[in-house]
Design a protein with these regions (language model features):
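Solvent-exposed, well-ordered loop and adjacent helix/strand elements within mature globular domains
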Residues: 1-290
């Protein structure tokens, strides 16, 4: 029963307020999800956007070619030909997949058969992520930097789509994994190495919040409201500091809608067993700006 669970929680776990080094206890909560794509194994007139596995010569932590170079260098494209997992029709959908880090796909093979897969994060080209929505806002091109606003801008300026995509130099590489029916309710593996749970898993800065930490999250907004227990199981390139998180919303249309709306203030408390002593029990501080 909910009352019994709450009683067990307060009897066995001690909350410690999480703060930045500057003493700030409020930060930003955004979301991420697993997008769903329809892909083709073979390139055709409608499917022209490649999704790559790790390329030859790639090394973690080293910078590789930018998105613009990969899109415009014929010799490099030829060298990458055997690393194309599948082809997408919509460049924006492909970019969303890369930003989210993983996704689910139905791949149509050349013989017409279809394969259900997960495209799991394998690595990236070492360049920093740059938001195309923020760039459009900074350039005065739009007043709406959301994905709906970006899509509307692209429809109005299709001839400028490629240059917009090149604003973000980062390219994410994937690993194809079979997605059996019995695994349909299991999330992708996060940085901790365990499958993510919708609305319970969060991505954090592991330098501030260790993986596996249970946290009591409080937030109020249109997309998410109230308090709940979450677990730090993943990370993201834009997450810096102790009071900053991505909330895993899951997969499907409802998860997508929540992710697109989720940008609000948050506070949270690290939940530690009452039997664990702490030298400084007042707060858990990180290194970021919150």
């Amino acid at each position: 029963e909910p009352g019994q669970r709450w009683q067990w929680l307060i009897e066995h776990w001690q909350p410690y307020a999480v703060q930045t080094d500057q003493g700030q206890d409020q930060g930003l909560l955004t979301g991420y999800f697993e997008p769903e794509l329809q892909l083709r194994r073979a390139r055709d007139d409608a499917h022209q956007v490649p999704l790559y596995a790790l390329p030859h010569g790639w090394q973690s932590g080293q910078r590789w070619h930018t998105r613009q170079v990969m899109d415009s260098d014929p010799a490099l494209q030829q060298a990458l030909a055997d690393k194309v997992i599948a082809w997408a029709a919509d460049p924006i959908e492909a970019l969303v997949l890369q930003i989210q880090g993983s996704g689910r796909a139905t791949i149509t093979e050349p013989d017409g058969s279809q394969r259900r897969v997960r495209l799991a994060f394998a690595g990236h080209n070492g360049h920093p992520y740059r938001s195309i929505g923020r760039w459009l806002l900074d350039q005065g091109e739009t007043r709406d930097g959301s994905w709906d606003g970006i899509t509307a801008w692209v429809r109005a300026h299709p001839q400028r789509l490629q240059s917009l995509l090149w604003v973000n130099p980062r390219v994410v590489f994937f690993r194809e994994e079979p997605l059996a029916p019995q695994a349909a309710d299991i999330g992708p593996r996060g940085a901790q190495g365990v499958p993510l749970t919708p609305r319970r898993s969060v991505a954090v800065d592991p330098n501030s919040v260790p993986y596996g930490t249970a946290l009591w999250l409080q937030t109020e907004g249109v997309a998410l409201s109230g308090a709940r227990m979450v677990v730090a199981q993943d990370t993201g390139g834009a997450i810096v500091g102790a009071v900053r998180a991505y909330f895993f919303t899951g997969w499907g249309q409802a998860a997508k809608d929540t992710e697109y709306q989720l940008k609000q203030r948050m506070r949270w408390w690290a939940l530690l067993p009452r039997t664990v002593p702490l030298d400084q029990p007042t707060s858990t501080k990180g290194t970021g700006d919150g």
